């Protein structure tokens, strides 16, 4: 059932830049909206994707894996976007997480966008394959993953997109060779829930 699309050559993992401008004032930005996670499955799925890397990462390079953290683009007039999970390689938190200027993923602090972002579909109105697809392309995220376990948006529960030029092309495989990771689905029990989970390989 693979789509017949042309898959572009892997996008090189971007390195942090060292000539970024002076960080703007973030005191007026909303970094937390106290909105609850949409459902328990989504909460557990985010845990699988973030915690697995923290306990098993063997690459020897720093990384940041987080859930429900806002990404703020460099352009001051662009609104933040909050993926369910993000993974950024070769970076470390630039400061204490309790400070407002370090609570979110400000691209001007890290020098680059995350390598991968995930959206976990819980309803048909989240815009995961429309507005969010466009936003992540605009801020130059190399890989965008939509996990739709109930097939609410598509007959394919897992779709992976790779940035090609200014837009995304859907991948026909689940591997990220330039990052050294891949994805698979697994049916089993995690923390009391028996579900079809998305996990790293």
Region spans (language model):
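A structural signal for short, well-ordered beta-strand segments and their strand-loop junctions
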Residues: 64-66, 145-148
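A short acidic/basic microdomain associated with nuclease active sites
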Residues: 59-71
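C-terminal interaction segment
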Residues: 1-38, 43, 52-55, 71-77, ...
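Short acidic/polar active-site loop segments enriched in Thr and Asp
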Residues: 142
């Amino acid at each position: 059932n693979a789509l017949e699309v042309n898959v572009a050559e892997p996008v090189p993992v971007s390195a942090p830049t060292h000539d970024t401008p002076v960080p703007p004032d973030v005191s007026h930005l909303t970094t937390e909206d106290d909105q609850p996670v949409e459902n328990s499955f989504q909460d557990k799925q985010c845990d699988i994707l973030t915690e697995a890397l923290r306990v098993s990462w063997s690459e020897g390079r720093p990384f940041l894996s987080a859930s429900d953290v806002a990404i703020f683009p460099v352009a001051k007039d662009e609104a933040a976007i909050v993926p369910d999970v993000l993974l950024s390689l070769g970076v470390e938190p630039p400061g204490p997480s309790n400070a407002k200027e370090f609570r979110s993923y400000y691209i001007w602090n890290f020098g680059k966008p995350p390598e991968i972002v995930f959206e976990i579909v819980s309803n048909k109105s989240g815009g995961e394959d429309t507005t969010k697809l466009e936003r992540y392309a605009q801020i130059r995220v190399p890989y965008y993953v939509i996990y739709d376990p109930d097939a609410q948006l598509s007959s394919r529960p897992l779709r992976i997109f790779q940035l090609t030029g200014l837009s995304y092309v859907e991948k026909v495989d689940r591997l990220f060779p330039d990052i050294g990771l891949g994805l698979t689905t697994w049916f089993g029990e995690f923390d009391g829930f028996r579900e079809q989970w998305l996990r790293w390989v």
